[in-house]
Amino acid sequence: MTVSLPSHSVSRDAPDRLMLNRLPARAGIGLKPEHFRAILHNKPDIGFFEIHAENYLVAGGPFHQALTTIRQDYPLSIHGVGLSIGGENPLNQTHLQRVAALVERYQPAVFSEHLAWSTHNDLFLNDLLPLPYTDVTLTRVCEHIDQVQNALRRPILLENPSTYIEFSASTMSETDFISEVVRRTGCGLLLDVNNLYISGVNHNRCPRQMLLELPLHRVGEIHLAGYTESRDGANDLLLIDSHDSHVTGPVWDLYNKTLRKTGPIATLIEWDSNIPPLDVLLNEASHAQHYITESKKHATTTVSSTS
């Protein structure tokens, strides 16, 4: 059975937002095998865990054994990295069905993917590559998202990318492109605040202004991560989305401004390289939780002052 989802206009009222916010408005962390033992033994007070779908596409093994137990105690988010939603080629149906089976097995609160491409013909590239923002690309991305949502029988969240180059062929901005994808497909937005900051700095744009141009009423989850500073060929500052360090001060500041606009949203700390001890991730999550709690107070104060 497949479910037909809207291909054009979607409602922007409160029920849409509630449907996308199925994770608790708390901070979570990525579930790493290095931490399985500590999590199973200590059961830390954390809002949710997130996994990369492609790490769990086999039928069994120790990853599934640990996840099955952990899933009993925590909400789960599944994050895809290999569907190549922005690719020129048709979606790999075998891969899509394996992802759908994983979603059916664990019933995560949300499923998300990237606005990027990573395959071309039979070639798989171990990266998330940018795409031109054109009408042709827009149509293709929307068709791919419709296919994924039908296969998974649910709306997905689409993550804004971190980019290092732009295409002269683009006819619209990244924020306009994302807004139109959300409008046409009914998907939600996984707002990666780190990516937003990186792309703004790399392309000499104001990250805060970019934030205001996004469909914030459709945010179902937020990502935070660390970046690395580098230099391009012209010796200009280039930020790299490395996911291997603490969240930086400017990203925390942009995150705080985000929550003042959206209200409390489930927030993930991403740390995918140079994995630290679990306590380090829990401390980062605690910092995010502080901002979430403050945003709840701000929302309550705002409502009270307008009553």
Swiss-Prot record:
Belongs to the UPF0276 family. Gene3D superfamilies: Divalent-metal-dependent TIM barrel enzymes (3.20.20.150). It holds the Pfam family MbnB_TglH_ChrH. InterPro entries: MbnB/TglH/ChrH, Xyl_isomerase-like_sf. This is UPF0276 protein plu0081. HAMAP family: UPF0276 (MF_00697).
